[in-house]
Curated annotation (Swiss-Prot):
Residues bearing PTM N6-(pyridoxal phosphate)lysine: K242
Reactions mediated catalytically: (6R)-5,10-methylene-5,6,7,8-tetrahydrofolate + glycine + H2O = (6S)-5,6,7,8-tetrahydrofolate + L-serine
NCBIfam families listed in its UniProt record: PRK00011.1 (NF000586)
EC primary class: transferase
Name of the protein: Serine hydroxymethyltransferase
Gene source species: Sphingopyxis alaskensis (strain DSM 13593 / LMG 18877 / RB2256) (Sphingomonas alaskensis)
Lineage per the UniProt record: Bacteria, Pseudomonadati, Pseudomonadota, Alphaproteobacteria, Sphingomonadales
Enzyme Commission number(s) of this protein: 2.1.2.1
């Protein structure tokens, strides 16, 4: 086999100058379609938000090129001084934001953060106690299909049938019966505030550690609009997007130095290799934004808007799980209307409103169908919608749901077209990413 000697440097024309529109028109076209979707659809998915241009710029920065295994000042690669600077900024801002002693900003996601806590503080086969999916919990809290449900003896608690609030009598009974190593508070579709003090008392009673997953409401805590779990939990996990308005990623917080050391070892080298420095840079930017006074206004408005949306839907005849919301999300039980979550979220998307089908407490339908939808206010609040706009959105959603009730699973094309027009007009009044 002959090897030809190359006497010229290898460099692709345009490699450092051409943008994606030139290099890959197919991807560029998809990016354009996604931008238009975000600009002209109303986003009600409670776990989604709209980041600032500054966060986008940081995430698309040259930090994507850098490997930085380890932690600030203790890296396994050279050339990490700028990475140290930006990660330390993220850590310090997170500690200030949540008034805590230790922060690990390296988890790639909320699921990775939860997995790292379990790796650090439990062993495979240990008992964990978390909220069941149908009560509003999350996959990573011990659901059977997830790693947490396969590698651990996962026991699940639920909510009361009469008011859909956490059944603390059940939590206490299960904790005393099973003696879990870890109790998990938090969820992905629970609209009320959690009694962190009660969870901690139960954990202390059985010698368990308490983990609070505040992925959904972290931004509300940061903005002072929601109680903080930091004084009660041994460890707190969160995502950095959702109500926190940062890039998609995870984070772990604690006030316990010994736990912090175990968490750091569990994240790296236990669960992950190199951190995503471009994402950590974007986290630092988002945390800096959340430290500004106006973020407190955002957090308060997010809750007020969610309540306005839930109240309008309730006035239009919808059944609101737990009677309303204290947070950024509401869960709508569609069984009184005789329609499914799948039919509802598909009809709403045809109407230029995105939400997600979601199980409701004691749901008889499978997760691919569900008896409910979950709606949220974070993205709409970010683009400037207020109470009046969310009340109007409530009417739009109710019009589509009423059409499904009256016309069947395919809905009413005329109603959906009318709502699309109203959505477009509203979005044009509150533009995003212009120029």
């Amino acid at each position: 086999m002959t090897t030809e000697t190359l006497d010229k440097p290898i460099k692709s024309a345009g490699y450092f100058t051409d943008g994606v529109a030139i290099v890959d028109p197919a991807v560029a076209a998809a990016m354009t379609r996604e931008l238009e979707r975000e600009q002209y659809q109303i986003e009600l998915i409670a776990s989604e938000n709209i980041v600032s241009r500054a966060v986008l710029e940081a995430q698309g920065s040259v930090f994507t090129n850098k490997y930085a295994e380890g932690y600030p000042g203790r890296r396994y690669y050279q050339g990490c001084a700028p990475s140290d600077e930006v990660e330390q900024l993220a850590i310090d801002r997170a500690k200030q934001l949540f008034d805590c002693g230790y922060a690990n900003v390296q988890p790639h996601s909320g699921a990775q953060a939860n997995g790292a806590v379990m790796l650090a503080l439990t062993k495979p086969g240990a008992t964990i106690l978390g909220m069941s999916l149908d009560a509003g919990g999350h996959l990573t809290h011990g659901a059977p299909p997830a790693m947490s449900g396969k590698w651990f003896n996962a026991v699940q608690y639920g909510v009361r049938a009469d008011d859909h609030l956490v059944d603390f009598d059940q939590v206490e009974a299960l904790a005393r019966e099973h003696r879990p190593a870890l109790i998990i508070a938090g969820g992905s579709a629970y609209p009320r505030t959690l009694d962190f003090a009660r969870f901690r008392a139960i954990a202390d009673d059985v010698g368990a550690l308490l983990m609070v997953d505040m992925a959904h409401f972290a931004g509300l805590v940061a903005g002072g609009a929601h109680p903080s779990p930091m004084q009660y939990a041994h460890v707190v996990t969160t995502t950095t997007h959702k109500t926190l308005r940062g890039p998609r990623g995870g984070m772990i917080l604690t006030n316990d130095e010994a736990i912090a050391k175990r968490i750091n070892s569990a994240v790296f080298p236990g669960l992950q290799g190199g951190p995503l420095m471009h994402v950590i840079a974007a986290k630092a930017v988002a945390f800096g934004e959340a430290l500004r006074p106006e973020f407190k206004d955002y957090a308060k408005a997010t809750i007020a808007n969610a309540q306005a949306l839930a109240n309008r839907l309730k006035a239009r005849g919808a059944d609101i799980v737990a009677g309303g919301t204290d947070t950024h999300l509401a869960l709508i039980d569609l069984r009184p209307l005789g329609i499914t979550g799948r039919d509802a979220d598909e009809a709403l998307e045809r109407s230029a409103i995105t939400c997600n089908k979601n199980g409701v407490p004691f749901d008889p339908l499978p997760p691919v169908k569900t008896s409910g939808i979950r709606v949220g206010s974070p993205a709409g609040t970010t683009r400037g919608f207020g109470i009046a706009e969310f009340e109007a959105i409530g009417d739009m959603v109710a019009d589509v749901l009423d059409a499904l009730r009256d016309k069947g699973e395919h809905g009413d094309a005329d109603v959906e077209a009318d709502v699309r027009g109203r959505v477009r007009a509203l979005c044009e009044r509150f533009p995003i990413y212009q120029g």
